[in-house]
């Protein structure tokens, strides 16, 4: 614990809080164009081929975004909407692509949690 004299000499440093989604620039979502769509493997205990896309946003930044759900129709030059939200087992992936908006189709045959995957109500 510092003495009063030490505090007078050098004041306490403010803790700077880092944003978890800096590319969104305080917006809830952002639009972008896919520059590359590919699969990648997760960190140590897990094993899979996770679908991700490199997206160039309207503000000029380029980020890696996760494509949620089973199956997708994305390819290079697809226009997508991204939101915040990281994928814990993919380092560097801090954004999710919103399904069912712009060029991204909703997940087919999805019955539960449909609103998160842009799926219409089954008949």
Swiss-Prot record:
Modified residues (3-methylthioaspartic acid): 89
Record-level Gene Ontology MF annotations: rRNA binding; structural constituent of ribosome; tRNA binding
Comp. bias regions, Basic residues: 113-123
Keyword rRNA-binding: yes
CC per GO annotation: small ribosomal subunit
Record carries keyword Ribonucleoprotein: yes
Keywords annotated in UniProt: Methylation, Ribonucleoprotein, Ribosomal protein, RNA-binding, rRNA-binding, tRNA-binding
Start and end residues of each stretch annotated as Disordered: 103-123
CDD domains assigned: Ribosomal_S12 (cd03368)
Gene Ontology terms: biological process: translation
Domain of life of the source: Bacteria
Family listed: Belongs to the universal ribosomal protein uS12 family.
Entry function: With S4 and S5 plays an important role in translational accuracy. Interacts with and stabilizes bases of the 16S rRNA that are involved in tRNA selection in the A site and with the mRNA backbone. Located at the interface of the 30S and 50S subunits, it traverses the body of the 30S subunit contacting proteins on the other side and probably holding the rRNA structure together. The combined cluster of proteins S8, S12 and S17 appears to hold together the shoulder and platform of the 30S subunit.
Quaternary assembly: Part of the 30S ribosomal subunit. Contacts proteins S8 and S17. May interact with IF1 in the 30S initiation complex.
Cross-referenced HAMAP family: Ribosomal_uS12_B
Protein's name according to its UniProt entry: Small ribosomal subunit protein uS12
Organism: Nitratidesulfovibrio vulgaris (strain ATCC 29579 / DSM 644 / CCUG 34227 / NCIMB 8303 / VKM B-1760 / Hildenborough) (Desulfovibrio vulgaris)
Name of the gene: rpsL
């Amino acid at each position: 614990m510092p003495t009063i004299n030490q505090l007078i000499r050098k004041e306490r440093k403010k803790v700077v809080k880092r944003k978890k989604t800096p590319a969104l620039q305080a917006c809830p979502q952002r639009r972008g164009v896919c520059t590359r769509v590919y699969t990648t493997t997760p960190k140590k205990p897990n094993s899979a081929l996770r679908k991700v896309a490199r997206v160039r946003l309207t503000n000029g930044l380029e980020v890696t975004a996760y494509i949620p759900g089973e199956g997708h129709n994305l390819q290079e030059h697809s226009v997508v909407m991204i939101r915040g939200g990281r994928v814990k087992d993919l380092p560097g992936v801090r954004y999710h692509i919103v399904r069912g908006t712009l060029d991204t189709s909703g997940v087919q045959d999805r019955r539960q949690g449909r609103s998160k995957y842009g799926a219409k109500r089954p008949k």
